Amino acid sequence: MHKLIIKYNKQLKMLNLRDGKTYTISEDERADITLKSLGEVIHLEQNNQGTWQANHTSINKVLVRKGDLDDITLQLYTEADYASFAYPSIQDTMTIGSNAYDDMVIQSLMNAIIIKDFQSIQETQYVRIVHDKNTDVYINYELQEQLTNKAYIGDHIYVEGIWLEVQADGLNVLSQNTVASSLIRLTQEMPHAQADDYNTYHRSPRIIHREPTDDIKIERPPQPIQKNNTVIWRSIIPPLVMIALTVVIFLVRPIGIYILMMIGMSTVTIVFGITTYFSEKKKYNKDVEKREKDYKAYLDNKSKEINKAIKAQRFSLNYHYPTVAEIKDIVETKAPRIYEKTSHHHDFLHYKLGIANVEKSFKLDYQEEEFNQRRDELFDDAKELYEFYTDVEQAPLINDLNHGPIAYIGARHLILEELEKMLIQLSTFHSYHDLEFLFVTREDEVETLKWARWLPHMTLRGQNIRGFVYNQRTRDQILTSIYSMIKERIQAVRERSRSNEQIIFTPQLVFVITDMSLIIDHVILEYVNQDLSEYGISLIFVEDVIESLPEHVDTIIDIKSRTEGELITKEKELVQLKFTPENIDNVDKEYIARRLANLIHVEHLKNAIPDSITFLEMYNVKEVDQLDVVNRWRQNETYKTMAVPLGVRGKDDILSLNLHEKAHGPHGLVAGTTGSGKSEIIQSYILSLAINFHPHEVAFLLIDYKGGGMANLFKDLVHLVGTITNLDGDEAMRALTSIKAELRKRQRLFGEHDVNHINQYHKLFKEGVATEPMPHLFIISDEFAELKSEQPDFMKELVSTARIGRSLGIHLILATQKPSGVVDDQIWSNSKFKLALKVQDRQDSNEILKTPDAADITLPGRAYLQVGNNEIYELFQSAWSGATYDIEGDKLEVEDKTIYMINDYGQLQAINKDLSGLEDEETKENQTELEAVIDHIESITTRLEIEEVKRPWLPPLPENVYQEDLVETDFRKLWSDDAKEVELTLGLKDVPEEQYQGPMVLQLKKAGHIALIGSPGYGRTTFLHNIIFDVARHHRPDQAHMYLFDFGTNGLMPVTDIPHVADYFTVDQEDKIAKAIRKIHDIISERKRLLSQERVVNIEQYNKETGNSIPNVFLIIDNYDTVKESPFMEEYEEMMSKVTREGLALGVYIILSGSRSSAIKSAIFTNIKTRVALYLFENNELTNIIGSYKKGVKDVKGRAAINDDNFTQFQIAQPFELAEGQTYNERIKNEVAQMKEFYVGDYPKHIPMMPDKVFMEDIREAYDLEKIIHEEHKLPLGLDFEDVELVSLDLTSSSIVTAIKPTEMEKMNDVIMSSLSVYSKNQFVILVDAEDNMSQYSEDVTSYYSAPSDLSNIRLGFKQEIEARKNGEKSIEECKIVFINNIKRFNQLTGMTEDEIRVLFNEGQKVNIIIIASGLYSDTIGAFDRESKMMVRTINQALISHKISEQEFIRVKDRFGEPELKVGEMYYINNQEYQKIKLMEG
């Protein structure tokens, strides 16, 4: 062990050096030592001799290097430089210096320092350091400015190359110079830095002191000694009586010797009786004494035996259930007893309640004395012994949490203290892997239990939160998860009950409820009200009184006071056992909790399998160049083996996965829950294959249903031939079609080369016989469970396809998070290998492996490989390719500077602003090993110019396609004099059956009319815009005319300025649309006439025969649905029917859009050959449009399907791609302007529409009025509504001008006179002003008459002039125009007869005298007098301000619903024909 002190520019650092490791010193915060402004990087390492070097320069005690701002001093200390001295025992001041009188003498120390106040260090925890101003003193590596400073226990002091550490009993010293001192040395060994695994804790073998359980039997006393009950007098009296009788007999009759014999015998009998009596009595007394002595000795031995057993029991209890003070010592010393209890031990979840007289662990057997009249004291002694050892006095009273809910009752503060003792006991002896606590308590009680937050057992690891519920937020955050956990455990028990297999749930949850109000309205209440012991959950209730407890509580503990408690019931049995709770006032509970918090419990010794291994470590390389990819590609051949490294079984023990058909392949399953490393193991496998096999031998098709995450990682990998993400119904069918197309292609190539297996083909390809590469295709689905759920048909077909394609080199790898219910028989039978990482439960493990092993995996990346029927079954650690690629090799790790606060829930909460932990200017994006390897392969591919394999899976159609990407769009290059066949490029089509994507082109001659049906907002207008621009760019304006019917929301308005557009119509322009309908009818009729004239059948033949170029006409209709609701529906549909029937041959095409096919009349829709469908809200509508189509159209704007043979889908092209900052309308205007500037020629004519007002000046600009009036002898009136052409009064015949209202009459007169004023310059014009209100025109005419006398004269003048001209007396060449203002009044004033009127109007026009008569309708046409009727009969020309249906000048067909005429509107009638006109204004 070495210590290195680095000093530079007043910065001081210390580094503990470990043998075999390397270190860096630099400005970089990721370095082991960071020194500001250092200006270089110093690498510390050992050479072969073990000498430490700085940038290859050995450090011999001190090494000084030149730095940018100061010298860099490196001082190396070894064990030999270490010493430790006690403080002086008497004085309170000591000196360290170079003088002999100093308490500690170090010759190299130039200036002495003083250590003071160490005698009180136990109380103050510090000493004082005093030095002079010339001495630099560092405390904890910070330079001190003051001359006196405090140094606390554990602080480091550095002064002039001397390192000191303050301890409670002395100073530790590091000095490269000899330290001489009279002080007591404490130790000679330098303390080592803590090992890397200092805080790890492994269980030691447990020592269990069993409580005695052997029965002890107290035998009954021996049977009492039977006492001889014979009374001595009974033995004496008979012989005495015999003697007395003998004497009586002798006195009566002396017998002699016989008497002596009788007396002798009786005497002897008496003697023997007396002796026998006393002898037996003595023996009896001895036997009684011996019986009593022997039995008491037996009882004494039994007492010793019982006492020994009791002592053993008490020792066992005290050992396994120590006091809290003893527990503190156990934790403090990190004793091996910590976490000694497991769920398999008999005393799991047992804890001490207190001290009590507890039941013996052994059975003391004693048989009571049966009924006996005589009392046997020995029975009493035995009974006394039996009763004396009824209990074990003053022993720990044990309770457990295994047998039903328990409850504490009493004062809450006392109960909380008991719960604290329980917490300490259970937490010390049970690992947090096996036991967790959840407290539902009052918020005010959390402070009492605050110390327990340090216990690792208080963290619910499944929820990553502390097990405290004390308010609404914590309740919702925790209890819902606990509810789900309980539910899952109950379900597991129900399922396992069928197999009679016991389940042990871990961790055990101790659920303490001190406040029921928090759960009373929560769903978890249904489980709290039952016994959950079977499910690994122990319930503890706390209430004030027993009446408040739930009925299912089995054990009740009453805490009466701090010194008295009572175990009322235990497991439903009444025990009423009093006990004395332990006093823990002097125990630091938080200290115990903090000590336990420091321990990281490792349940098993580290396996040979590493916890993790990076991808490059698996290949035993540091840089990607060392992978030797090119050589691997050259040497490895898939037809021999496809084995590639996937992970390690142990150190240098590589596990390979070989999907060769004869090895582990060709198909397989991967299962692993979230966070198990499932995606990572797939990534490593893909990367391993890519490293070992050429892109022409191995390729990947990724199905990432979760959204393309994995696909994005490999987007630059040359082996990747396609990705399938986010499949919907349409994409699923497309994917299947593409895969099947690939199979057909492979079968075709096999047939061409007469092989039937991929391996044979690869041999031919290596030999150069086969030229098209055909790699093994790995189809990998990262989450097929969801895919199968959403697209079951696709999944079924995919598995079936893979089964068929095994000889064609198709490999299928299916991955899922939860295999239960997903892996069916077909998938299982087709999957030879299975990879199982950590799965959610045993059922999932059994589903994939047929064993529960995978449910016990805890590490990410740890997996089982199973091949076949356990032909191979191995546990390994898969490689991780997401590790940071350290290309510089300096292994600098980014120091996370994020500051976290552990909040009240036990969760980390970042509190500093920069959550990245890095300064902005230092932020650096690190490349992963996966990215580095892919980049390396990509560079090799580029360098070797490897040709990409044809992709079986083309990417989904993009959502944005532009016309310029599909065809030439520069109209300058495309416009020509030659008439071209119309081809429309609709967009980018997708033909998975042919593995092709390209322009969707329609030859309009074959395709015919086009109907696009789609829901609003899905590209209908874009479709039309694209066609409009496509036509405009390929044909000049004189070759293509477009009529835009915009019945939607003005979507076609932006393109109206395109020079090809003849006109633009909206639905409210009824008159204009009516004109357009007539215009189209005229076009049809005219073109039919031309074809008939040339005897050809279509417009192309006509153009060819005649050399003419009749333009194609396009009727483009947006939102056809509106037609159904329009007033012009019938006329429009009639026109549409005609065009759809006859238009194709005539070069008239319809392209329409709508939202419903039903809006189009069936007769019309039937004639539309090409039908296109966008996405539709109503699915059944699709069938009506394009026929029976199973795929459907994707919900993407612009995605469409067409009714060709394959129901081809395509993405509608947009007419152009916008430049940055450019708007859509700006882009259109730019191109339109360029077209107009480039084109020289005629533009298509607009549909003429009547302006709001017709001004004389506008007429003058548009027409040559002088010519019309003087040469054509016509008088301009206004514009015709139909053609918007000039309508003029014929001045070669008389006419009448009439109106209903006088005001209208005046206006009409003004218009007539305005035109006549031009005419009068060269012609003779007479104004007869019978109304006398037009005198303002008197100067503009040749003659003006208004006086009644003048009018009478003029009547005669008319007659004479007509006669003179008829007789030839006057020339008829000179035309005289006579305008009569108010013809009725003129007749009244002049008295003209019927015949005179006939002559004036009929005969006068024959001799070039033209009468223009004006008057109100009621006075002229509507009058009933004979003169008026004569006038009407003789005139063929009229200008009437009256509805045509109501006038009587000519007869017309009934016109129902004719609108009222607006101001300035009127009818011009000539020879029974009429035109609606708008009168011009001055």
From Swiss-Prot:
Keywords: ATP-binding, Cell membrane, Membrane, Nucleotide-binding, Repeat, Transmembrane, Transmembrane helix, Virulence. This is Type VII secretion system protein EssC. Residues 1-229, 280-1482 are cytoplasmic. The chain crosses the membrane at residues 230-252, 257-279. It holds the Pfam family FtsK_SpoIIIE. Residues 652-846, 997-1183 form the FtsK domain. It is found in: Cell membrane. Residues 253-256 are extracellular. Belongs to the EssC family. One of its GO terms (cellular component) is plasma membrane. The keyword Iron does not apply. ATP binds at residues 672-679, 1014-1021. Component of the type VII secretion system (Ess). Required for the secretion of substrates including EsxA and EsxB. However, unable to support secretion of the substrate protein EsxC. Homooligomer. Interacts with EsaE. InterPro entries: Firmicutes_EssC_C, Firmicutes_EssC_N, FtsK/SpoIIIE/SftA, FtsK_dom, P-loop_NTPase, SMAD_FHA_dom_sf. PANTHER family: DNA TRANSLOCASE FTSK, SPORULATION PROTEIN RELATED. This strain lacks esxB and esxC. It is a multi-pass membrane protein. One of its GO terms (molecular function) is DNA binding.
